Each structure stands twice: as C-alpha cells, then as structure tokens.
Amino acid sequence: LTEKDSNVEVAVAVLQRPDGTFLMAQRPQGRAYEGYWEFPGGKVEAGESSYHALVRELHEELGIEVEKAYPWLTRVFTYPHATVRLNFFRVTSWEGEPHGREGQLLSWQRLPDLSVAPILPANIPIMRALQLPHLYAISNATELGTEVFLQRLQLALNNGLRLLQIREKDFPRPVLRELSLRAVELAHGSGARVLINADIELAQEVGADGVQLTGAQLAACDARPDFELCAASCHSAEELHRAAELSLDFALLSPVLPTKSHPGAVNLGWDRFATMAASCSIPVYALGGLQMQDMEMAWQKGAHGIALLRQAW
C-alpha cells in the first residue's frame, strides 16, 4: 500500500496446514507498518477477481500454486493512509513449499499462543475467527430424551466436537437448567464451548461460554452481551449486517435447504446463501437440512462451517 491509496481491494490468504498451523509473513522495510506480521496477500488489480489476485499474489510472494481456496470473510479496515477491503480466503491445499520470494520472513503459527509480534491491526479479529471449529452442534434432547442426548454428547465430544448450542424451546426452565448444567460440565471437560439459545440469564447461571441471540433479540440489542462467545441466528442480509455491527463472534444463516423442523419454509438455497455470506465480516455457519457431507459445499459457498441438529447425534 502506498500513501496515495484511498480505497483498496486486497486478497488475503490464511494458509492452513492439516495440523492446524497457519502462515504469517512480516511486512518488509519501507512499507506502511513495516515489521508487522500479517497474513500474506496483496492488491486486487483492475479487471481481476479477488480469487485470481490471491492465486497471483501467492505465486509472486511465496512461490506456491494454489490448489484449494475457500472464500471466508470480508472486512473493511481504515488505516491512516488508506481504507482497505480485505477479502480473506482459507487456503488448504497448494503445490510447493512457501518461501519469501520478496525477502520477507515467514513463520508458521498456532493459536492461541502466537510467537510473532506485533500483528497487523486488521488481522487481529481474524485470530478469534480461526479458533472457531467448523462444526456447530445444536442439542436435540427433546427428541432423544435427556439421558440419551447426554450420552450422545459425550460420544461426540470424544470424537472432537468443540462447539455446542443448547436449544430446547419446549423444556420447562428447571429441566432446561439441569440439562444445561450437565452439558456445560461435559463440554468443559473436553475443552469444548457451549452457547445457550436466547436465555442470557440462564447462560450466566450455568457457566456457559456464551449466548445465541434470536433474530428478535438481535434487533433489540444495543450492545454485545458480555460473554466470551456471542452469536446470532440470522435469516436475512440485514440481520447478518447487524450481527457484524455488534461485533458478534459468528452468525447462523438459515434455512439453506428444506428442513424437517420447518416444513414449507422458504429456503435460501446455496447460491443465495453464498451471496449473503460474501459480504459478511464475521464467520457464518450454514444451517438447515444439512449433513456432514455438505461441509465441502458450505466452504465453497463462503461458510465457516455448518450447524447440525438431528444429524449431529
């Protein structure tokens, strides 16, 4: 970026290895924020798509050929010298070994403990997003029964589940409280995090990690609730925008496909989902009529991951 840049489109790569590490590069001397660490990438040229800019920049900067890249987040960041629109991609497969072709230092990093500093300001929110797993499970104790659900939850946790929403609309509050307490205890024993649907007081009572706001709560909310994690259930571009305005950690966007729980509802379909997710600055999970095998499609359409209800258990 030069001093003359005022509104710049940038393609940014989060190169992720199977072991969970990701690549950061140090900005060279003589450029704005020299010495700061960032995700690699560069300016989108006139007539170029952000994806093609990504492929070109990674070849020029790192000497690699992109094989698989997924659109992820779009964030606008204002520096003193420029306003930049950052189009983030998760790059999971490439040919060649990344090396600094322009003399820049590179470092593979792992969250939560970064060994490089300082981090470019626009990249800091990305670190929180990277810590979110790709599967978000929603409880189904109403159909399974509490004891069977908790058994299935323990099994899922043993198999790597790390994010859970407790959502049982028809449970009396004392029953819901007991379920939530037990689910939080199980989840925390495996390093997983739990959000409670809609009930902020209950989330505080049971020591949950966060709350999942309904659309009505989102509309009425003046500020982000005080939790480690806060998300919202969205059905429109306007609701997604509001969730991002409140700096929520992520959003659910639904229904993508026809669902058993909402028969006859108008579903978005993948193309509308992709259009709505493309302009979102926070991670979006796809929900509605999905199965685990839809994860790849969800990534291609710009989702961070998928949320499952019946299919999770």
Functional labels for PLM-detected ranges:
Residues 2-23, 74:
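Conserved N-terminal beta-strand and adjoining loop/helix that marks the start
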Residues 21-61, 72-73:
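Conserved Nudix-box catalytic region and its N-terminal flanking loop in Nudix hydrolases
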Residues 88-92, 98-131:
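NUDIX/MutT-family hydrolases
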Residues 133-148, 229-234:
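Active-site mouth loops of central-metabolism enzymes
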Residues 176-198, 215-218, 222-236, 265-291:
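Alpha-helix-loop-beta-strand connector modules within alpha/beta enzyme cores
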Residues 214-223, 250-264, 289-313:
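Glycine-rich phosphate-binding active-site loops on the catalytic face of alpha/beta enzymes
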